[in-house]
Amino acid sequence: MLLSDKAIRSLIREGKLIIDPLYEDSIRENGVDMRIGPEIAFPIVRGEVMDPTKDDPSLHFTVRRFSDEGIIIPGNTSILLVTEEYIKMPDDVAALCGLRSSIARWGFIAAPTLVDAGFEGQLTIEVMWTRPAPVRLYRGIRFLHVVFFRTEGKVERPYSGAYQGQRGVTLPKRLEK
């Protein structure tokens, strides 16, 4: 069941769902808007074949911090954005993230991202700027909408994977065959 603003506020008030910082205007009718955090990761294009099962991900990305002037994203570029907010999920709630329609209408796209029950950390989301012209982004822009769903009871194994507790933009892990 998709949780309403009232149900989300109740989970937060009870300390079962933690979102920090939480801005009052972030809680929407059926979800929470999140803001662009302090860092961004750009791909490093070398023209060589990447092997995500063998390569060190840090060789293929460069991480930068936002300044007051923002950061210019080149046209047709994939980036990793991190949320300003740190989230701690209950063991009986999962979430689905998508871009806010206002940012999508400018030309950004992102694959829907699942947040597992029991996850905690800042969210790192891959976003694609689809226009040929560069665009300037700023820290603090509301870019992500997160909707919450109750699971049928608490999950037996809450999330405890490689991204648990992540802070800052987090690069992908190596893929397993």
Curated annotation (Swiss-Prot):
It catalyses: dCTP + H2O + H(+) = dUTP + NH4(+). One of its GO terms (biological process) is dUTP biosynthetic process. Its EC number is 3.5.4.13. It comes from the Archaea. DCTP binds at residues 100-105, 116, 159, 166. Keywords: Hydrolase, Nucleotide metabolism, Nucleotide-binding. SUPFAM superfamilies: dUTPase-like. Pathway: Pyrimidine metabolism; dUMP biosynthesis; dUMP from dCTP (dUTP route): step 1/2. It is an enzyme of class 3 (hydrolase). GO terms for molecular function: dCTP deaminase activity; nucleotide binding. InterPro entries: dCTP_deaminase, dUTPase-like_sf, dUTPase_trimeric. The active site is at 126 (proton donor/acceptor). Catalyzes the deamination of dCTP to dUTP. Homotrimer. PANTHER family: DCTP DEAMINASE. Belongs to the dCTP deaminase family. This is dCTP deaminase. It comes from Korarchaeum cryptofilum (strain OPF8). The gene is dcd.
